[in-house]
């Protein structure tokens, strides 16, 4: 049994759903043939029980049991709040 906990950091790009946010995860991948580094992004649906995060926040998320068809991550903490001013 694998007890390794997956923890990622990302930026909230959408928070208009109830108890759900969409987090963008950026990673750098090396191209296998051209050996050039490429930026890749992944959009992950995250469960936010208290609706505390807003667009632009940098958050930490943890993998959990499936909550719905698309959500299997939960919000652990907000690392940095986004200020719009």
UniProtKB/Swiss-Prot annotation:
Keywords carried by this UniProt record: Ribonucleoprotein, Ribosomal protein, RNA-binding, rRNA-binding
One of the Pfam families matching this protein, by short name: Ribosomal_S17
Matching CDD domains: Ribosomal_uS17 (cd00364)
InterPro entries tied to this protein: NA-bd_OB-fold, Ribosomal_uS17, Ribosomal_uS17_bact/chlr, Ribosomal_uS17_CS
GO molecular function, one term: rRNA binding
A single cellular component GO annotation: cytosolic small ribosomal subunit
BP terms from Gene Ontology: translation
PANTHER family from the UniProt entry: 40S RIBOSOMAL PROTEIN S11 FAMILY MEMBER, SMALL RIBOSOMAL SUBUNIT PROTEIN US17M
Subunit structure, interactors included: Part of the 30S ribosomal subunit.
Function: One of the primary rRNA binding proteins, it binds specifically to the 5'-end of 16S ribosomal RNA.
Family the UniProt entry places it in: Belongs to the universal ribosomal protein uS17 family.
Name by which UniProt lists this protein: Small ribosomal subunit protein uS17
Natural source organism: Blochmanniella floridana
